[in-house]
Amino acid sequence: MTTAPERPGPLAGVRVLDLSIAATGPYACALLADQGADVIKVERPGFGDIARYVGVAHGGVSALYHACNRNKRSVTLDPHVPEGRAVLLELAARTDVFVQNFRPGVMERLGIGYADVRAVNPDVVYVSISGFGPDGPYAHKGAYDTVIQAYGGFAATQREVLPDGTTDDEPRFIKQTAADKVTALYASQAITAALYARAVGRGGQHLHLAMLDAVASFLWADAAGNEVLMDTDGSLPSSFVSTFRPYRFRDGWGIATPTADKDFLGLCRAFGVDDSDPRLQTHATRREHREFVAEVMETTYAVAAGLTTAAAIAALEAETVPCGVVLSPADLAADPHALAVGLLETHDHPDSGRVRLPRHPARFATTPAGPLTRAPRLGEHTDSVLADLGLDPAEIARLRELGAA
């Protein structure tokens, strides 16, 4: 691995050059940084990553940028300027992982495609994230999150399921950048796999990851049942969770998830419904008598509406039915369990003030990650990183005069 500023965590010593923008690549690299990698974010001089300006912002920096760029260093370089491209390739020669998320062909036209970077660093793990991948009829289509939610099945599978098991006609988007973040999860896992392959002597490689592929892979197991089993009659919804609805209580909302037979019968008892009917006893009998089961479920919703949240949850927990309350992000931040496990960390940012973010969810016993560090200001580390390459202050100033840094 390359020499990098030591951060604690299992990826300590790994250096990542992050040329990506928005959410997919930046979030993938943030996950690597959480685990100890030294991530150098390369941004456009004077403007930076577009994510700095999207959504809720304070002090000129968005919440999205803070969340996707924690634990990183920021360098400004413009590969459109020959001098900027030359310095970027010098950095690439000293990195383990190179990440970009532009349309196929963009990096090649700039002279920083895989072949260019491999020429200076044969063992590099070069990661290309795009909407549809490098080939196929959609390869050169532009793609943001909602485009991939539409193509990948997310929007269609969010249609409302009616009591009779049919769905309405209106597709719905998941109200967050779900396609971006799912892709980022696959990317961070694939990067660590490629680093392992390199560590055991298989060399570097070019890793392509299409957002469409990531969403399809993520969705297929539990939301595309009739496409997995191609010979079914299609009488059941493809998603076995599509009929789940939250319970409205007198003073709030909650959920019960009666997946196992004992849980379903416990749900009935918790809300005073007779659980002895033979049509309710097993998955098979409930599937056979779906209309009757729908009536039973509507009864549980009616009973629940007259209970307080505390009373309803207590009744469900007494029957050991998996259940919970619906919390907003603000509620979660104050939840006693979240506080007890240190789910969120707060730090100060010179422009945005107090910033609160979740820690990495994996807690490593022998290689623990350190506390989160704040997202960088635009170009905050340009001088120090370029000095590490051997550039003196006059050379760095010259790059700025040229618009290269």
Language model segments and positions:
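Aromatic-enriched alpha-helical interface/lid elements that frame and gate functional surfaces
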Residues: 243-319, 323
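Terminal low-complexity tails and localization/encapsulation signals of metabolic enzymes
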Residues: 1-15, 248-249, 331-405
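Short, surface-exposed loop/helix-turn segments at secondary-structure junctions
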Residues: 52-55, 225-234, 271, 335-349
